Amino acid sequence: MESRNNLYPIFLKAKALHVLIIGGGNVAEEKLHFLLKSSPDAKVTIVSPMFREGTLALANSFDVELIYDTYNNSYLKGKHLVIATTDIPEVNVEVYNDCKARHILVNVADNPPYCDFYMGGIVTKGHVKIAISTNGQSPTTAKRLRQFFEDVIPENVDDLVQNLNEFRKTIKGDFEQKVQTLNEFTKGLISKK
């Protein structure tokens, strides 16, 4: 039987959400780095008894709240997304169960059965953002695809986006007419010569 990726891709306004990261090791630092790289205005709190130097530097460069403590479910109050990165599987499962009871989306790092969402590879060029998922099967493949797209998408792609946005503002008609006009205007971008 053929398998497929049934995940629904969504782009979140992280500034409007409160993200909680549980753990202070390498994985927490990596998750924080990629979250802030994509959404530098994200509201983030990290709970851990210790933090790596790189995590401290990131927290100081951005508006990240550090709480020196072990996990307690009271830290879930007011949170919208939670990422569990501890090296203690029982704690990660506890975080997962606590989040599920509160209807909070949760990601237990490197444990797909305990993930409501994955943090895939992300390519950003100006206003263009592409997210890549392997359905949790191969983060390395997502990383390589991200590197590929970073290389092949031109740096000036944002100029195209801005120009099309300006053109869109000048189009007359109802929504369907505008879509048809834009589709006709942009089909040359993908036509094979």
For each feature predicted by the language model, list its residue ranges.
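Glycine-rich adenosine-cofactor-binding loop
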Residues: 10-33, 163-175
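Residue-level detector of alpha-helix initiation sites
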Residues: 26-27, 90, 136
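Glycine-rich, highly charged phosphate/nucleotide-binding loops
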Residues: 60-77
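E1/E1-like adenylate-forming module used to activate ubiquitin-like modifiers
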Residues: 105-158
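NAD(P)-binding Rossmann-fold cofactor-contacting core
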Residues: 30, 38-58
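An accessory alpha-helical subdomain
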Residues: 136-193
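A short, basic/flexible loop-to-alpha-helix module at the beginning of a structural domain
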Residues: 1-14, 119-120
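ADP-ribose/adenylate-binding Rossmann-like module
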Residues: 81-87, 92-118
